């Protein structure tokens, strides 16, 4: 017989996001991944800034605390979110988690694409995310893989990300220290 547990000390969430590339270049010459601007010759098709890494983290964090998905909270049909920085969505998701008494313990993020090359930007991404979420960088793992030229990603038509977030129950529902947006 399965018994109900009132307060689960740890919770796990899984997130996924995918966006296609447009044939046109981005207006400012870069795309944004995990809050970091990366020079790239193609624009990401998206309603917001198209940051697939951050979108996957938002989805994982919302799922972790039973708050649905990024599309429920920030629908791409709502003009308020047009060109919005995805860091706003992540801070909102973190706020919802903290309001329920959960803090992010660690996360693992995989970005899937052929181009742009992600590995050179990972240290900057980890630093940005650690400052944004008020976490130690050692609790953050960001990596990149390709699809070995298979499928739409392999043909260079898009980019995807998978995220796993582990949260722990905390005694006080207060913001993590340093959880201001480092982009200003």
UniProtKB/Swiss-Prot annotation:
PROSITE patterns: ISPF. Homotrimer. Involved in the biosynthesis of isopentenyl diphosphate (IPP) and dimethylallyl diphosphate (DMAPP), two major building blocks of isoprenoid compounds. Catalyzes the conversion of 4-diphosphocytidyl-2-C-methyl-D-erythritol 2-phosphate (CDP-ME2P) to 2-C-methyl-D-erythritol 2,4-cyclodiphosphate (ME-CPP) with a corresponding release of cytidine 5-monophosphate (CMP). It comes from Anaplasma marginale (strain St. Maries). This is 2-C-methyl-D-erythritol 2,4-cyclodiphosphate synthase. One of its GO terms (molecular function) is metal ion binding. The keyword Magnesium does not apply. The keyword Lyase applies. The gene is ispF. It catalyses: 4-CDP-2-C-methyl-D-erythritol 2-phosphate = 2-C-methyl-D-erythritol 2,4-cyclic diphosphate + CMP. Binds 1 divalent metal cation per subunit. Its cofactor is a divalent metal cation. Its EC number is 4.6.1.12. CDD domains: MECDP_synthase (cd00554). 4-CDP-2-C-methyl-D-erythritol 2-phosphate binds at residues 17-19, 47-48, 74-78, 152, 155. The record marks 47, 146 as: Transition state stabilizer. Belongs to the IspF family.
